[in-house]
Swiss-Prot record:
The lineage of its organism: Bacteria, Pseudomonadati, Pseudomonadota, Gammaproteobacteria, Pasteurellales. GO terms for molecular function: polyamine binding. Pfam families: SBP_bac_8 (PF13416). SUPFAM superfamilies: Periplasmic binding protein-like II. This is Spermidine/putrescine-binding periplasmic protein 1. Gene3D superfamilies: Periplasmic binding protein-like II. Residues 1-16 form the signal peptide. Belongs to the bacterial solute-binding protein PotD/PotF family. GO terms for cellular component: periplasmic space.
Amino acid sequence: MKKFAGLITASFVAATLTACNDKDAKQETAKATAAANDTVYLYTWTEYVPDGLLDEFTKETGIKVIVSSLESNETMYAKLKTQGESGGYDVIAPSNYFVSKMAREGMLKELDHSKLPVLKELDPDWLNKPYDKGNKYSLPQLLGAPGIAFNTNTYKGEQFTSWADLWKPEFANKVQLLDDAREVFNIALLKIGQDPNTQDPAIIKQAYEELLKLRPNVLSFNSDNPANSFISGEVEVGQLWNGSVRIAKKEKAPLNMVFPKEGPVLWVDTLAIPATAKNSEGAHKLINYMLGKKTAEKLTLAIGYPTSNIEAKKALPKEITEDPAIYPSADILKNSHWQDDVGDAIQFYEQYYQELKAAK
């Protein structure tokens, strides 16, 4: 009996310990889940989160936001591919032409529109675009439109009606281009009358040869702080984004920008949830907050890019909304192109772009 009793006691103790361990494990899991739900990891462009922008969100929801700086769509894509299921981001900010690519490859979660009441505040003209029909995977945040910027103390603007004007000999060693393969190739493709989203290697090569003719005019390539070169006076003519125009004008730089007759190639930066997101609930809350009227207004005031929020646009000063260099007119938008994913052809763009930068 003692031996049997001992076996019973041992079994009881083992069962008790197992139950305790299971309980501890469940408690730890619950704690980890609670901690995860208290934090949202945001991967976005550096300038899109000016100081204090997210303070109100944390105050309202109790959710802490950890921000990582997004350097390029290509880097973001590669990082998410490499991380796989262990991906550490809840909200990302892909440009429209990467939304279609990532959605196709199963890298994005479908949005729950019932958790995004901000949808009713967004401009219908920005929604349901070919890159994301029905906005299943993304919501638009800001619009980018590159044009030809110039120092108004030196130029009056009549010199700039076409992208081809940047090739004029009078601009030798004076032109700043955006440090982005697609942006640079866009202007050459439009100059020669081709689709800026071409995937034809022969046409891409033709655009490269056209850019080699432009190379003697190129002083610099700059996408990090392209407005600063104009503010300092180092550059007086070049390719610039509309948001950068606002930044330069805030600094009282003598600068204006025009959109050439071929039209700009537009892009939209969006907010989306990666398929590997751990806090989908918090992600929806953050997207709702970032696209909301108050936040959208603050962001456009800070960095100049047009917002998708109609109510925020109404609240913005006219010096922004009525400046055609910042908010392109309806006619310009009709004459514009959308930057799309070029698939595997991106390798040709990147290869020729590196050769272009190395050329003298």
